[in-house]
Each structure stands twice: as C-alpha cells, then as structure tokens.
Amino acid sequence: MNNTNGELVIRRPNPQDARDVYQLIRDSQTLDLNSAYAYLVLCDYFRETCVIAEGGSQVVGFLSAFRSPLCSDTLFVWQIAVAGSHRKQGIGKRMLTYLLS
C-alpha cells in the first residue's frame, strides 16, 4: 500500500532503499549511524515495521521500528529521520500514521 500526497509517497522500504537510508541517517548528524548492512537488513527483513518517505525519486524520510514477539501490543520506534530540506512538513507524523494503520 502506497500513500501519495502530491509528490510525496509513503511506503514500505525494499532492499534497494538501504543505501539511500544509510545516507539519510548519516546526513542527519544527530542519529546514531548503523552500518550500511544494518539498514539493508531493516529494509528487507524488518520492512513491515519500517517506512520510507519518497519525494520524487529521492528518499527524504525513514522510520524504523520493532514489534516484540513477547509483547505484540508494544511498538518500539527506533529511528525517525527526515531530510533537512523536508522538515517541518509533518512527514515524520505521516510515516508514523502509515505504520500504525
């Protein structure tokens, strides 16, 4: 399921997004940067609890989360990143809403 609003698309990630996600997190300069491999694993094996915001063909947002198998009604949000050029537009909130829907 994709959620399009204007040129912004909110969707699940795929393995091809991992490099762009890594660069987005690196460029944020505020979030802990994991290895490129960690983002590949998130975009592939944990894609059901991760979200991409795409503006045009560019990844401008990423949300990663984890649902514990021991407590299925709890969602741990690990990272939320939005490109500096796209902040203050409600993208983080839209990604979280998409994930919870």
Language-model features, listed with the residues they occupy:
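Conserved N-terminal entry element of GNAT/NAT acetyltransferase domains
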Residues: M1-Q16
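Conserved GNAT acetyl-CoA-binding A-motif
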Residues: S101
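Active-site acidic-Proline motif in GNAT/NAT acetyltransferases
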Residues: A83-Q89
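Acetyl-CoA-dependent GNAT
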Residues: R12-W78, A83, L96-Y98
